[in-house]
């Protein structure tokens, strides 16, 4: 391509509003709810997430919710039942219920090996969740990370466990960055923001064509 390229997000729906963040002096809750969302398939790598939680220092305090459907559902449920200290919820959630589900969480983990835009990560950030995202050459999701503690090498179970423990150990940072991610997402990835960028792109293209 010889023309200028513009990358514009699909955007997220305005019903994904941010949750109320905890006060800076509040400890991490027990149970500490980790939310993941996506197809229950190999490339989404929820197996790594379950294994990582099992290796966390705070494993006994963590509750896992994975919203999605797919061929690995029963395998993931069996694995979670065997490895995790608390019962996990793994399965279908209505789209209408997703904003409330995300707001009920404390941390968003996206362990996927392969992705396109990862709208589920955008929706989680819009809801005020700090993301912990797999850094993968086959996924675009890593671009959403605003600090190192939001990234881990793809499929590195021990690194993911350390990231999860770090956020549980630092509740003030979790609250601060939850608000930061929500504001950043609203500014850069809302449908309104995407429309503005698209209109600006069209105007630029028209102006260039007239030269």
Regions found by a protein language model. Give the residues of each.
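Carbohydrate-associated surface elements
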Residues: 11
């Amino acid at each position: 391509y010889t023309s200028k390229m513009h990358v514009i997000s699909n955007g997220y729906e305005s019903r994904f509003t941010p949750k109320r963040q905890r006060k800076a002096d509040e400890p991490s809750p027990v149970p500490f709810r980790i939310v993941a969302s996506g197809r229950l398939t190999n490339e989404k790598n929820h197996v790594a997430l379950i294994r990582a939680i099992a290796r966390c220092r705070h494993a006994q305090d963590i509750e896992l919710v994975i919203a999605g459907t797919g061929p690995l559902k029963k395998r993931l449920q069996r694995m979670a039942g065997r490895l995790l200290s608390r019962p996990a919820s793994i399965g279908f959630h209505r789209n209408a219920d997703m904003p409330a589900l995300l707001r009920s969480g404390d941390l968003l983990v996206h362990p996927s090996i392969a992705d396109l835009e990862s709208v589920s990560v955008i929706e989680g950030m819009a809801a005020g969740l700090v993301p912990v995202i797999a850094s993968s050459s086959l996924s675009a999701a890593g671009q959403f990370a605003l600090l190192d503690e939001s990234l881990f090498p793809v499929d590195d179970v021990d690194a993911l466990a350390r990231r999860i423990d770090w956020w549980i150990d630092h509740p003030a940072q979790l609250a601060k960055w939850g608000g930061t991610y929500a504001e950043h997402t609203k500014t850069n990835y809302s449908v309104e923001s995407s429309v503005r960028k698209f209109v600006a792109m069209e105007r630029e293209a028209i102006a260039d064509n007239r030269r």
